[in-house]
Amino acid sequence: MNFGATFWGPMISFALFVWFTMKYVWPPIQTAMADRQKQIADGLAAGERGQKELDQAKSEVDKMLREAREQASQVIAQANKRQSELVEQAREEARQEAERVLAQARSEIDTEISQARDALRKEVVNLAVAGSSRILKREIDAKAHKDLIDDLVKQL
């Protein structure tokens, strides 16, 4: 065996293999690895951007919810205030109406009392006139006079 041919033959074959690999095989592998590395980096960056956007969207949603709750609270407060105003207004109107009805009833009662007094006065006057005319028609004597007055008192 020849040491030179045995040694140099595989060395030259290996060198040709390395040169061929470096020239034709390695550049596409490096390009594929670089592309893959770029895709992974882009994917990670997109994931981070997506996470930031998600966090931002969550904060905006929370802010919108807080604002909506505040607006709802304000609307409820305004509705409660309006309800209280309406109830108070209705109470005041009812009180005024009750006072008006009461005043009208008092006025009607006073009118009826006045009419009853007038009617009673007229009746008393009529009875007095009737009694006087009866007294004057009869003789004036004490017993007849007393009987006539008793009769008038019974009629009252």
From Swiss-Prot:
Gene3D superfamilies: F1F0 ATP synthase subunit B, membrane domain. One of its GO terms (cellular component) is plasma membrane. InterPro entries: ATP_synth_B-like_membr_sf (IPR028987), ATP_synth_b/b'su_bac/chlpt (IPR002146), ATP_synth_F0_bsu_bac (IPR005864), ATP_synthase_B_chain (IPR050059). The keyword Electron transport does not apply. Belongs to the ATPase B chain family. F-type ATPases have 2 components, F(1) - the catalytic core - and F(0) - the membrane proton channel. F(1) has five subunits: alpha(3), beta(3), gamma(1), delta(1), epsilon(1). F(0) has three main subunits: a(1), b(2) and c(10-14). The alpha and beta chains form an alternating ring which encloses part of the gamma chain. F(1) is attached to F(0) by a central stalk formed by the gamma and epsilon chains, while a peripheral stalk is formed by the delta and b chains. This is ATP synthase subunit b.
